[in-house]
């Protein structure tokens, strides 16, 4: 499949299409064997850790506080992530005010992660990271562009929080470059982008060789099925929008209570079934 899209380019839309086909083939294999995907891949664990992810810069204070309080209080998820890097790094003061608010809401014990979506310059990211550490931030995602491998490595060498990137890796080669550059403390991967389940497993194996953990980007219910079979998985992103869509249209969605997703060994294949009638009103083609 990768050779077939060489002339139009492997990254972007082509990669997501390849990833979808690969994932579907794994689903077919599990169906033919009559077993859950998690069992087919081999279970290293019965459940996978998740972190609540949302906290968009467009949220007002009350909205941010309510979302964080629900994750930590209602769902008992012990780790959460918010967005920073508003206006492409042009509003550091509000970024830091929101981090301070988040820490106040979740209390001293929950882990606090931030994602700048590549908004900062290298020196700026180092400066911001020093302030983040004051609030106990332990995860700094894409402090600079994920294409700036030298910049990521420079930030990583100078800051206390773990530096993470990789959600835009479209191939095994992309992940290999991040690892070789010493750009990350934790490699992010996305089954829907990196070549499907096959690509995710291959990149995870590369990370094992570099003594790195991996973290799954979005699509939490899909990644949970894969994640139980990945020995170096650190956690899965329980992303606000994705989990909402999964609940709207699918049966078999897992509950994140206690900060863990637990694939049901009694549910075969990918574990979810599309409710086609619920999705039909949103059809556009």
Language-model segments: residues:
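Flexible, glycine/charged-enriched surface loops at secondary-structure junctions
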Residues: 37-40, 139-143, 217
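N-terminal capping/lid subdomain adjacent to the active-site entrance of alpha/beta enzymes
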Residues: 1-112, 117-119, 126, 130-134, ...
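Hydrophobic faces of well-ordered beta-strands that scaffold small-molecule active sites
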Residues: 50-54, 78-82, 110-116, 140-141, ...
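Short, active-site-adjacent cap segments at secondary-structure transitions
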Residues: 120-121, 223
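Shared catalytic-loop signature of beta/alpha-barrel
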Residues: 130, 136, 147-260
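Short, surface-exposed acidic/glycine-rich loop or hinge patches that mediate macromolecular interfaces
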Residues: 55-58, 119, 145, 168-169, ...
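Conserved protein kinase catalytic core
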Residues: 87-89, 121, 147-148, 196
């Amino acid at each position: 499949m990768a050779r077939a899209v060489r002339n139009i380019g492997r990254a972007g839309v082509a990669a997501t299409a390849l990833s979808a086909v690969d994932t579907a083939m794994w689903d077919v294999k599990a169906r033919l064997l009559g077993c859950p995907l998690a069992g087919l891949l081999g279970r290293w664990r019965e459940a996978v850790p998740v972190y609540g992810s949302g906290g968009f810069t467009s949220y007002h204070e009350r909205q941010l506080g309510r979302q964080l309080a629900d994750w930590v209080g209602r769902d008992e998820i012990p780790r959460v992530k918010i967005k920073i890097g508003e206006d492409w790094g042009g509003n550091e003061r509000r970024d830091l005010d929101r981090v301070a608010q988040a820490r106040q809401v979740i209390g001293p014990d929950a882990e606090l992660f931030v994602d700048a979506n590549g908004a900062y310059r290298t020196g700026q990211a180092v400066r911001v990271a020093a302030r983040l550490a004051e609030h106990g931030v332990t995860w700094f995602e894409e402090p600079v562009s994920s294409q700036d491998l030298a910049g990521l490595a420079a930030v990583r060498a100078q800051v206390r929080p773990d530096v993470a990137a990789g959600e835009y890796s479209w191939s095994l080669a992309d992940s290999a470059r991040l690892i070789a550059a010493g750009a990350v403390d934790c490699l992010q991967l996305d089954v829907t982008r990196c070549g499907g389940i096959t690509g995710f497993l291959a990149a995870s194996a590369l990370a094992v060789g570099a003594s790195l953990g991996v973290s799954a980007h979005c699509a939490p219910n899909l990644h949970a099925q894969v994640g139980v079979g990945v020995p170096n998985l650190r956690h899965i992103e329980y992303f606000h929008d994705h989990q909402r869509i999964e609940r709207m249209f699918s049966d078999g969605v897992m509950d994140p209570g206690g900060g863990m997703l637990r694939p049901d060994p009694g549910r075969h294949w990918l574990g979810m079934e599309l409710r086609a009638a619920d999705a039909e009103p949103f059809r556009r083609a």
